[in-house]
Design a protein with these regions (language model features):
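Binding-site signature for planar aromatic cofactors or substrates
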Residues: 1-154
Length: 154
């Protein structure tokens, strides 16, 4: 009797092309990422975000349409820890959990990139670009994608 081979495990924190494509195409495939954070008064918060995008090999970004919204207030009040969750069962199983620290980046080049890389649906909800760019420096990525187990750490 043969033992099935274990799937490969990636431990270096570097977003793979498959992870980037999944995150960047989520809304186009009718999915959004769940984003969890802690409010300034210490309460857990959870919301769906359609503009989550891979920003670099070690960062995600979100265009936050409301510059006074809860996640922005949390980050600005010293509660930068953010978790994001993605799951799908078909056409193939993908489960991803991202953990990191968010920061508002006001540099015009960053704002422009995050806004323009957001899905058109999201951009159309903030045509005047009143939102802010939230960049998440990742600490870990866990999950399963493309036959690979992810246990990535910074």
């Amino acid at each position: 009797m043969t033992n099935p081979t274990s799937p490969p495990v990636l431990t270096e924190l570097k977003l793979t092309p498959a992870v980037k494509d999944t995150v960047n195409g989520a809304l186009d495939h009718g999915r959004m990422l769940s984003v969890a954070y802690v409010s300034p008064d210490g309460k857990p918060e959870l919301s769906f975000r359609g503009s989550v995008q891979a920003y670099s090999d070690t960062q995600l970004a979100i265009w936050v349409r409301n510059p006074e919204g809860g996640i922005v207030q949390a980050v600005r009040s010293g509660k930068p820890h953010i978790s994001l969750l993605y799951g799908q069962l078909a056409p193939e199983k993908v489960f991803l959990t991202f953990r990191g620290r968010g920061r508002i980046d006001s540099a015009e080049a960053v704002r422009k990139a995050v806004y323009e890389n957001s899905p058109e649906l999201e951009r159309n909800l903030d045509k005047d670009r009143k939102g802010v760019a939230l960049v998440i420096d990742l600490d870990s990525v866990d999950g399963f994608i493309a036959g690979t187990v992810l246990k990535m750490r910074r």
